[in-house]
Every structure is written in C-alpha cells, then in structure tokens.
C-alpha cells in the first residue's frame, strides 16, 4: 500500500529520513503515527526508526540530545522540530514482566517491528509513502481488529502493561480484540500486579478519556483484569454500573470527572484512599474528592450560592454533565445565575483583610481572627453584606460587641 499524499507532519520530517538514507542507512516512520494516518486520525508524535546506531545517528546531525541512548533513542533538533530517532533493536528476556534485561541494536527493520505489541502498531512508512507491513497489520486495520504481533502469550509475558494498552486501544480506536490475543490477555492479567501503579494509571486514564471507553471497560471486565488493579478487586458490578448508568453517547469532559464517576459507580467510601492507592498527586486527590462531595450535595438538593462560591462554576458544571448523562434533572441556568450573583469569587477579593482587623480593631492573629474573617466572607457571599470597607468595618464592630 502506498499513500497518495504525505500528511504535513511527515512532510516536515522527510528531510530527516533523507539525511539518514544519504548517510547509507535505512529510516522509516513507525508506530502509532503511521497507524493514525491510515485511520485518518490526528497525528500526535512522529517517531522514526533507523538502522543507524546511536553514535552513527549523532554523527549525521549537528544538534542532538541523548534522551534514551541506552535504548537506542536520540533526540534530533532539525528544521525547527524535535524528532526522536531510535535504532532498530531486539530485546532479551524481560525481567519482572516489565523491562528487557538487555537491548541489542540490529540493522533489520523486521527484527525491530516483531518486538512491538499489536500488528496495527507494527507498521512502517518510507520516504515515498510506501507502507511496510510485515505482520498483516493493514488487514487488521481494515477489519478494526487488535491482534498481538507473533505469539500473544510472549508479548504479554514480556510486558504485562500491554494488556492495559490493549484495553486502551480498544477504547480509543473502537477495535475488537482478536480471540487468541484476548485469551492471552485474560490468562496473563494477574501479571498486572507486577506493573508499576503509575504506568497502569496512565493507561486507565487514557482509556477513560477515549471516545469508546465502554468498549475498553467491557474488555477489562471480560478479562477479569480489574481484580489486579488498585481498589478494583471484586468490583465487576460497579464497573458494569459505570457502563450502563450513562447515556451511550456520553464521553467524559476531563479526567477529574471520569475518575470521580468511577468512584461514584463503585460506591467508594473513601475516595482519597482509593486515589492514593493509584499514586495520584495530592492536587488531583483534592479536586476529585471535592467533585464527588459536590455531586452528593446535588443529589440531595439544588445548588445554592455558597456551593458555587466554595466549589466553583466549572466543578458544578461537571456535576450537571454527569446528571444529564444519567437523565436526571439539570439546571445550568441556575449555576450561571448564581455565579453572576456572586460579589466575590475568592476571599482575596474582600476589600478588608486580617491586617486591617489587627491594626484597626486590635485583634490578635489566631482562631478568633480567622473566625471573624470567615463571618465576613460568608455574609458577603450570602448577600447580607456589601464588599465595602466602611460597611465591613461596621459589621465587625457589631460582631465584636455581641
């Protein structure tokens, strides 16, 4: 198969391939970018594979950076762009089902492609637009099928994260997993416990944000892979609820919303501990935990002005999106009205602060001062007090007198 026209991302990188070939080596576009071009999807990263060894690659170009030279990767700075160029390689026995014990550089494109995970990711493209397909990846693309390169059992024994990648690709590409590949994923799912939580989180996160995330979750359920992921053991019912409780065409607005609804569906009692098990950042834990709290408030009643002030318009909108996807009542107009009615959106918007209370009223720093500032803040938010210096001073005097 030959492309009639090269996408602009590849055209810009063609001089890189040309330079390498003029130096006497082979060079090809490889991986996900080739797959995405053939599927008419946006290209995110342009990866280049070559028969030149790292030091040979560095000798060809003036500006290079060693970003992973032990694995054969050199970053080339050329034509206003940055390109990762990786030497063809083979990999020895994997240790801990995660990483190869040794990487060996080779001159053969086929040897390099056979170590990849799925046939649709094992395609290469030369400078003339000719697709090199050693493992029937083009047929799998046409039939929307995800199939492991070579022996599926070996691919997942080498790196068990490929199981999570399989779920993610099913979700992002809307592909079905080929039967032998699926069975190998199922039988090797216990190996996911060997994978770092951070790597699994990245794949699960991408799955949740994919347009066909239900397909990925369904495959995960069918493989019983969830039993080997943090906080998901024996959560088949919760994951099924996640799939069926939202409208078929619903996709998550952002990953905070996605993870919040995962925990809502699973009826997680301690969201922070659940997210800690996934080794997420403290900021992520705080935001998602607040989002769940606001969701539960909304289950009980309509939003009030204080809710919008404390949680923000964006978070309230994420909650309403989830309610709409469940065919529950929504009121975006109310959110907008309440937000517009807020005199302040943050305590720093208040014209009087703690320094003024210490200076003008002789208050001391401590709990009493903090409590007074909270009273002022609440009164302004609820509309009982104008955000005016003189008015606030009068309010404080009255409070101190009681």
UniProtKB/Swiss-Prot annotation:
Please indicate which superkingdom the organism of origin belongs to.
Bacteria
Q: Does the keyword Oxidoreductase apply?
A: no
- What one GO molecular function would you report for this record? magnesium ion binding
Miscellaneous comment: A single active site specifically recognizes both ATP and CTP and is responsible for their addition.
Main function: Catalyzes the addition and repair of the essential 3'-terminal CCA sequence in tRNAs without using a nucleic acid template. Adds these three nucleotides in the order of C, C, and A to the tRNA nucleotide-73, using CTP and ATP as substrates and producing inorganic pyrophosphate. tRNA 3'-terminal CCA addition is required both for tRNA processing and repair. Also involved in tRNA surveillance by mediating tandem CCA addition to generate a CCACCA at the 3' terminus of unstable tRNAs. While stable tRNAs receive only 3'-terminal CCA, unstable tRNAs are marked with CCACCA and rapidly degraded.
Q: Which PANTHER family match?
A: CCA TRNA NUCLEOTIDYLTRANSFERASE 1, MITOCHONDRIAL
Its recorded name reads CCA-adding enzyme
This chain's source organism reads: Streptococcus pyogenes serotype M1
């Amino acid at each position: 198969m030959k492309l009639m026209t090269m996408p602009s991302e590849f055209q810009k990188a063609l001089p890189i391939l040309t330079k390498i070939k003029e130096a006497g080596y082979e060079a090809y576009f490889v991986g996900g970018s080739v797959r995405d071009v053939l599927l008419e999807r946006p290209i995110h990263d342009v990866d280049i594979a070559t028969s030149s060894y790292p030091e040979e690659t560095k000798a060809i170009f003036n500006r290079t950076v060693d970003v992973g030279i032990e694995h054969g990767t050199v970053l080339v700075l050329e034509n206003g762009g940055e390109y990762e160029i990786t030497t063809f390689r083979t990999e020895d026995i994997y240790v801990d089902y995660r990483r190869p014990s040794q990487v060996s550089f080779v001159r053969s494109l086929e040897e390099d492609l056979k170590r990849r995970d799925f046939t649709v990711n094992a395609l290469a493209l030369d400078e003339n637009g000719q697709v090199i397909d050693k493992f029937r990846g083009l047929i799998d693309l046409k039939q929307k099928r995800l199939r492991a390169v070579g022996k599926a059992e070996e691919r997942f024994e080498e790196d068990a994260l490929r199981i999570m990648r399989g779920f993610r690709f099913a979700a992002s590409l809307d592909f079905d997993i080929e039967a032998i590949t699926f069975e190998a994923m199922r039988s090797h799912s216990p190996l996911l416990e060997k994978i770092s939580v951070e790597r699994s989180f990245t794949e699960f996160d991408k799955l949740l944000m994919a347009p066909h995330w239900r397909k990925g979750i369904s495959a995960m359920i069918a493989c019983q892979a969830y039993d080997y992921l943090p906080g998901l053991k024996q959560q088949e019912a919760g994951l099924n609820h996640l799939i069926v409780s939202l409208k078929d065409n619903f996709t998550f607005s952002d990953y905070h919303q996605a993870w919040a609804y995962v925990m809502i569906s699973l009826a997680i009692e301690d969201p922070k501990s659940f997210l800690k098990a996934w080794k997420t950042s403290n900021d992520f834990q705080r935001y998602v935990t607040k989002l769940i709290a606001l969701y539960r408030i909304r289950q009980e009643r309509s939003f009030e002005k204080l809710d919008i002030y404390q949680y923000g318009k964006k978070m309230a909108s994420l909650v309403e999106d989830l309610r709409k996807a469940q065919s529950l009542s929504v009121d975006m107009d109310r959110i907008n009205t309440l937000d517009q009615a807020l005199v302040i959106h943050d305590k720093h918007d208040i014209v009087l602060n703690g320094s003024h209370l210490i200076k003008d009223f002789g208050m001391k720093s401590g709990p009493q001062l903090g409590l007074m500032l909270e009273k002022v803040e609440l009164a302004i938010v609820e509309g009982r007090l104008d955000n005016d210096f003189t008015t606030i001073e009068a309010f404080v005097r009255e409070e101190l007198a009681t």
